[in-house]
Amino acid sequence: EHARIASEVAHRNGLEFHAWMPCMLHKGLPSSWYAVNRKGERADSVQAYVPYYTCLDPNNKDVQAYLIDKYKRVAALPSVDYVQLDYIRYPDVILAKGLWSKYNLVMNEEYPTADYCYCDDCVAEFKAKTGIDIRSVQDPSKVKAWAQFRCDVITNFVNKLCAEIHAMGKKVSADVFPGPKSHAVWMVRQEWNK
C-alpha cells in the first residue's frame, strides 16, 4: 500500500518511482531460509555486527521464490517504474575500515561469525562443482572458488529476478556495495559489474 501511494504521488509530480526494498534482510521467516555462518549459526538467531543482519540464504529456492513473488507484486503496481534491490548481497565478511572503531574490531581476517553461507545445500553444491568440502578447509578465505561460488549465487539470483521483472515491462535498479568492484567481491560477495 505504501508503494502504491508513494508511486502515485511521484508520478503526479513528474518523478520516476523506484520501490526500494531490502532484498536479503528479513525477520520472521522460516529458520531454514536464513544463511548459516562458518560456525554453523543461522542468521535469524545470531547476527554479525548488528541485529538487523538477519540475512536470508540467496541460494535457497524457497527464498528465491518468496523474493521473486514479493518483487513482482510491487512491480505489478501501475505507477511503479522500478523495483530497487538493496542488500542484494551477503553480510559484510569484512567491515569497511571506517567502521572498525565503532564496533571495537580489528578486521585482519575473515571471521567465522560473519562468513556466510555454510548451510548444507551450499556446501554440497560447492563440493559437487569443485570436489572441495569447504567445511574441512582450515582457512576457507584462501579458497577463491568458494568466494566466487557465493558471488555467482548472488549474480544468478539477480539475473533470474530481473528476467521476471523485465517480462512485466518494468525495470530494476540496485543499491550496490560502494567502492572498487574488488572490495564488493571480497567484503560482501557481490559482483555488481555482472
Language-model features, listed with the residues they occupy:
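Conserved, mostly hydrophobic/aromatic
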Residues: 67, 74, 83-86, 165
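Hydrophobic faces of well-ordered beta-strands that scaffold small-molecule active sites
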Residues: 17-19, 83-86, 172-174
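Aromatic-lined substrate-binding rim segments of carbohydrate-active enzymes
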Residues: 1-29, 149-168
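Residue-level marker for beta-strand->alpha-helix junctions and adjacent short loops that shape enzyme
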Residues: 22-24, 90, 179
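Substrate-binding cleft/loops of secretory-pathway carbohydrate-active enzymes
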Residues: 93, 171-194
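Surface-exposed cleft-lining segments at the edges of enzyme active sites
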Residues: 57, 133-153
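Active-site-proximal loop/short-helix segments
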Residues: 33, 80, 84-142, 181, ...
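Active-site-adjacent "subsite" loops/lids of carbohydrate-active enzymes
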Residues: 3, 8, 18-78, 135-139
